[in-house]
């Protein structure tokens, strides 16, 4: 049924007053309405009070829509959009004000995640060369990014790493044991890998692999080995250490199921990680045999590296290290080291570690 004009009541309505929603059929009826009802015809004032009776009367016949409610909803949506636009404009303006002017500015510290998603591939992430290691940086806020405390230690005058340990227990027939994951911090690049293993990880190794000559394996006794004793036990244990390998010089977010064995007795941590790729910080797999590794992982006995890119990348890394050393002499690019009460150069305990399994990267695809 056609709705008639609310003024003359003869013709079908064509217009609706923006303020009071009275329906009119012509300009003449619209003017009569404004004079009779003292209506300005302008959009409502959002601060104006609307009584509950008027709100109920604005319902349609089926009580499915309400003009006042719809009007307030549109107003709030528009207000939210306006605030969002102003916030983004202010953020972009701050970037232009704080950004370097006229080329490189050595005093300007570039933000870690100041890259718009529209300007790059969604699978591409920021890359930082740290001590010759290709570090893929995850978006800020992800758990693995928050756990990363790798930085230049000004007190010790060397680089310290965060390392994720994944212990693979010996698998027995009919029994499947869970992996043990732990993140250790402040591991010096000049140490051997086994020297960076703290008490918590060492005690778990004793439990998983029944290491001989340790008090942790004796029932009722807590581990009381010193750092030197733990290092000797691990070196004689026959444990194998692996790390993930990625496509050479990659910049795309991905996970890898391919591992390479590390020569822990020949090189220090800095030399082991050089010319490799890690996601935020290194992940080290520990197992007694290759068969104990998680299902789906493959060990490469020789890490594949394209020879045509080796010399170019090595030259690039050497230049990056020279620039990094020059910046460290003047103003370190890593976050400053906070003062600690304990000796940072010899920390046997894992009090500074995150006893947290960390972020699993299995959901990423190669």
Curated annotation (Swiss-Prot):
Q: Where in the cell is it found?
A: Nucleus
UniProt keyword list:
Metal-binding, Nucleus, Phosphoprotein, Ribosome biogenesis, Zinc, Zinc-finger
Domain of life of the native organism: Eukaryota
Give a yes or no for keyword DNA repair in this entry. Answer: no
Acidic residues: compositionally biased ranges: 321-332, 343-355
Instruction: Name its GO BP terms in alphabetical order.
Output: box C/D snoRNP assembly; maturation of LSU-rRNA from tricistronic rRNA transcript (SSU-rRNA, 5.8S rRNA, LSU-rRNA); ribosome biogenesis; sno(s)RNA metabolic process; snoRNA localization
Q: Enumerate the residues binding Zn(2+) 2.
A: 17, 20, 33, 39
User: What PROSITE patterns would the database entry show?
Assistant: ZF_HIT
> Which parts of the sequence are annotated with region: Disordered?
318-366
GO annotations of cellular component type = cytoplasm; nucleus; pre-snoRNP complex
In the UniProt record, does the keyword Zinc-finger occur? yes
Pfam families, per the entry: zf-HIT (PF04438)
Q: Which residues carry this modification: Phosphoserine?
A: 330
Residues that bind Zn(2+) 1, according to the entry? 5, 8, 25, 29
Q: Which InterPro entries match?
A: BCD1, Znf_HIT
Zinc finger (HIT-type) in chain: 5-39
- Single Gene Ontology MF annotation: zinc ion binding
- What function does this protein fulfil? Required for box C/D snoRNAs accumulation involved in snoRNA processing, snoRNA transport to the nucleolus and ribosome biogenesis.
The miscellaneous comment for this protein is:
Present with 2800 molecules/cell in log phase SD medium.
Give the protein family: Belongs to the BCD1 family.
Q: What is this protein called?
A: Box C/D snoRNA protein 1
Organism (species): Saccharomyces cerevisiae (strain ATCC 204508 / S288c) (Baker's yeast)
């Amino acid at each position: 049924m056609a709705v008639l004009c609310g003024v003359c009541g003869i013709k079908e309505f064509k217009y609706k007053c923006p303020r009071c929603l009275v329906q009119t059929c012509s300009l003449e009826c619209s003017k009569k309405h404004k004079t009779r009802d003292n209506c300005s015809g302008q959009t409502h004032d959002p601060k104006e009070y609307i009584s509950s009776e008027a709100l109920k009367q604005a319902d349609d016949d089926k009580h499915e829509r309400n003009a006042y409610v719809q009007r307030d909803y549109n107003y709030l949506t528009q207000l939210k959009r306006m605030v969002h636009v102003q916030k983004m404009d202010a953020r972009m303006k701050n970037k232009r004000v704080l950004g370097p002017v006229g080329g490189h500015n050595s005093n300007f510290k570039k933000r870690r995640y100041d890259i718009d998603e529209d300007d790059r591939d969604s699978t591409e992430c920021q890359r930082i060369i740290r001590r010759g290691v290709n570090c893929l940086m995850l978006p800020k806020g992800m758990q693995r990014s928050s756990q990363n405390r790798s930085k230049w230690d000004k007190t010790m005058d060397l680089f310290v790493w965060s390392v994720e340990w994944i212990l693979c227990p010996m698998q027995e027939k009919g029994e499947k044991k869970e992996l043990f994951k732990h993140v250790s911090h402040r591991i010096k690049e000049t140490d051997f890998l086994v020297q960076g293993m703290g008490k918590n990880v060492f005690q778990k190794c004793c439990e998983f692999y029944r290491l001989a000559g340790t008090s942790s394996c004796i029932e009722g006794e807590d581990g009381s080995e010193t750092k030197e004793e733990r290092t000797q036990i691990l070196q004689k244990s026959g444990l194998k250490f692996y790390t993930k390998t990625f496509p050479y010089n990659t910049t795309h977010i991905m996970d890898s199921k391919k591992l390479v064995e590390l020569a822990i007795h020949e090189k220090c941590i800095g030399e082991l990680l050089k010319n490799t790729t890690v996601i935020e910080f290194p992940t080290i797999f520990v197992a007694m045999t290759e068969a104990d590794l998680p299902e789906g992982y493959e060990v490469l006995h020789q890490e594949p590296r394209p020879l045509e890119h080796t010399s170019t990348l090595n030259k690039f890394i050497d230049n990056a290290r020279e620039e990094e050393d020059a910046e460290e002499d003047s103003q370190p690019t890593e976050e400053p080291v906070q003062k600690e009460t304990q000796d940072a150069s010899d920390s046997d305990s894992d009090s500074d570690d995150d006893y947290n399994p960390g972020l699993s990267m299995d959901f990423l695809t190669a």
